[in-house]
Amino acid sequence: MTVEIAVQDVEGARIAHEEGADRVELCAALMGTGGLTPSFGMIQACSHVGVPQGVQVLIRPRGGSFVFADEEKYVQIADVRSAILAGASGVVVGGMTEDGRIDVPFTRALAEAARNEAVRCNRKVQVTYHRAFDMLDDQFAALDTLIELGFTRVLTSGGAACVPDGLGRLRELSEYAAGRIQIQACLLYTSP
């Protein structure tokens, strides 16, 4: 089982590494917004910590919905390129339409930007669809779309507030995916 821990700074990445995390997801403003795109410098610094499977970088310009204006889409595509250039082992991205489906043209552009920058940097990167997945109306059709777009994994709580409540759905998604894409259970934990 791969353990990925969301962090928002170098200290968090170091602690995650020391405690045995396989990889980290780097986000800014994690607790206030659910995570935003971190700075180029923060990505570089965290990429040097030595986490075995590296740093996955959340690309998200603001909190709130995952329906983005054209200007926000442009920013995210540029941020994907910058994150890979800064040393990210992958990016965590996504967008949806007002009617609860994946924004396919935008999501394709994000994945292509990541792969193109990876080629330019002469390394492989992973592309993950973030928890906007839990808000999609037809998650099985969404999995087919993400597989077609070449995504590595999808983050989901199974549509529940916490993973244990979503275990049944996680099992269904995993069976449907049948190894074509990784279903990664995720949750938000805050210490008491």
Model-derived segments and their meaning:
Residues 2-4, 23, 54-56, 89-92, ...:
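Structural preference for beta-strand elements that scaffold enzyme active sites
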Residues 8-15, 73-82, 137-144:
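Short, acidic/polar
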Residues 31-49, 98-113, 136-141, 161-174:
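Active-site-adjacent beta->alpha loops and helix N-cap segments on the catalytic face
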Residues 55-102:
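Glycine/small-residue-rich loop that forms an oxyanion/phosphate-binding "nest" at active or ligand-binding sites
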Residues 189-192:
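Conserved small/polar residues in nucleotide/adenosyl-binding loops
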Residues 16, 83, 130, 154:
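Conserved, mostly hydrophobic/aromatic
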Residues 1-8, 61-75, 129-137:
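Active-site mouth loops of central-metabolism enzymes
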